[in-house]
Design a protein with these regions (language model features):
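Amphipathic, interaction-prone secondary-structure segments
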Residues: 1-35
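Mixed-charge, Lys/Arg-enriched low-complexity segments
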Residues: 37-92
């Protein structure tokens, strides 16, 4: 298992990469780091499977970054929707 920390905007994600069920496949588990100084992890976890070469660090990094980008985009979208809904409720 390999562990990487990737930053996107003002968020940090801890990614654990483990061998998948098939050759050349890896499971990437992403945990958002809420307080980087204390390494407190958000309990919400995204399991993600990506075909990457586990022997090549650049391939692992590229695969993990694409998983984080996808997850980060979803979280950012959710946050925007929550903010818009809150503003709408305050106006009505």
């Amino acid at each position: 298992m390999k562990t990487l920390v990737i930053k996107r905007d003002n968020r940090q994600y801890q990614c654990e990469v483990t061998n998948g069920d098939f050759f050349g496949e890896a499971n990437v588990i992403i945990k958002e780091i809420i307080h980087p100084d204390r390494k407190f992890l958000r309990t919400e976890v995204l399991g993600y499977t990506k075909t990457i070469d586990l022997n090549a660090y650049s391939s692992i990094l590229k695969g993990v970054e694409s998983a984080v980008d996808k997850y980060h985009a979803e979280k950012t979208r959710e946050d925007r929707i929550k903010k818009m809904w809150k503003e709408f409720e305050e106006k009505t």
